[in-house]
Amino acid sequence: MKKSILTLIIISLFTIQSFAQPRADALVLYRNGKYAEAIKICEQEIVEDPQNIDSYCVLCWSLVRNRQYAEAEQRSAEARKINSTDVRLIEIQAEAKFYLGKNTAALELFQYYLANVPANGSRIGNAYYYMGEIYIRQAKYQHADISFSTAVHTEPLVDYWWTRCGYAREMTGNYNSALEAYSKAIELNGSNSDAIRGRERVVAKLR
């Protein structure tokens, strides 16, 4: 009898402990690069609360970082049926479309994001960077220069953005400004081979 009671107590304590364990934080998982795990948690949260926009945002961020672009596009569209003006959803939907090669749609969404996001928005620099890449794809190099220049003004410590800014300027024939951008990229990251080659090209053209 005593053994049976003891067994029941142990089972009860184990059950209580299991239910008491908090679910992993999807945002923390995302920030730690555990995208697949974050996706699973977000999917569970959305099943429990289909109106949970925060879960949709983390889900879509994780899908994009996990290179599941088509699914990110689909899920962000679902979320925007619930809240069409959430700037986080607008921006990540634009990213998904960018990676799917849907340049016009992505550009329109990035522009819409920038028109509506507060001045302290965390993805402003990224939006301008992606716009610059779209303009490069479209061979609109002056537009690309403007976008990349705004991106590096917003976040001046990203060496790759300076490299792309240098490339856009190089393609417009603005070699002095291209040299400045490539040099800044190398200053931030001395092993940036694209920036090193870019600087060599424009230095040769300036001779």
Task: Please place each PLM-identified region on the residue numbering.
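N-terminal leader/linker segments that initiate helical-solenoid repeat arrays
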Residues: 18-54, 207
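Register position in tetratricopeptide repeats
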Residues: 31-32, 65-66, 99-100, 133, ...
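Helix-start (N-cap) detector for alpha-helical repeat units in TPR-like alpha-solenoids
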Residues: 53-54, 87-88, 121-125, 158-160, ...
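Canonical tetratricopeptide repeat
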Residues: 58-61, 92, 126, 130, ...
